[in-house]
Each structure stands twice: as structure tokens, then as C-alpha cells.
Amino acid sequence: MDKSKRLFLKSKRSFRRRLPPIQSGDRIDYRNMSLISRFISEQGKILSRRVNRLSLKQQRLITIAIKQARILSSLPFLNNEKQFEKKRVGRYNY
């Protein structure tokens, strides 16, 4: 086999398939806080489907459950744990 054809052959590396984030026994519900909290960012935002690796139906159910939990006050709308310091930009820094 000449050198130009050898470049196109890929080595057969074994890879480990990732487990789905939601198992078949997991119940998507607004009361299941341990499940819901895995799909929320540090700022309290709902993570995208690409980041979560969920199917469309699962992402829709997770989104509805998160919104219900927010309305019922079991989950905050925003995570305000980080307090940002205001930095003045300009001539005078006090």
C-alpha cells in the first residue's frame, strides 16, 4: 500500500459509549430535585439539549419540570450565590 492511501485509513480505537443522562427508571417530575439539578447551570439557566445529550422529548419534559419547580418556589429563577463586584471604568477609581 502506498503512502497516500495509508493516510486515509483510520486506526480502530475502541471507545466507551457514554451512559444516557436519564435512565429508564428515572421519573421526570418537578419534585425530583436531584434529577432536575443536573440539567441546570451554575447561574440557574436550563442547559441546552446538546450539552445535556437528551432526546427532544426528554428535553421538553425536563424544561417543563424545571419551569414548574420555579413557579412553585422549590427552585430559584436565578442563582445569586456569586456576588459580582462593580468595577468603575473611567478616570476616577475610588
Curated annotation (Swiss-Prot):
Compartment(s): Plastid, Chloroplast
Sections of the chain in a coiled coil: none
Keyword Transferase attributed: no
Pfam families, per database record: Ribosomal_S18 (PF01084)
GO molecular function annotations of the record: rRNA binding; structural constituent of ribosome
GO biological process: translation
Keyword Plastid: yes
Matches recorded under InterPro entries: Ribosomal_bS18 (IPR001648), Ribosomal_bS18_CS (IPR018275), Ribosomal_bS18_sf (IPR036870)
Keywords: Chloroplast, Plastid, Ribonucleoprotein, Ribosomal protein, RNA-binding, rRNA-binding
An example Gene Ontology CC term for this record: ribosome
Subunit structure comment from the entry: Part of the 30S ribosomal subunit.
Protein family (similarity comment): Belongs to the bacterial ribosomal protein bS18 family.
Protein name from the UniProt record: Small ribosomal subunit protein bS18c
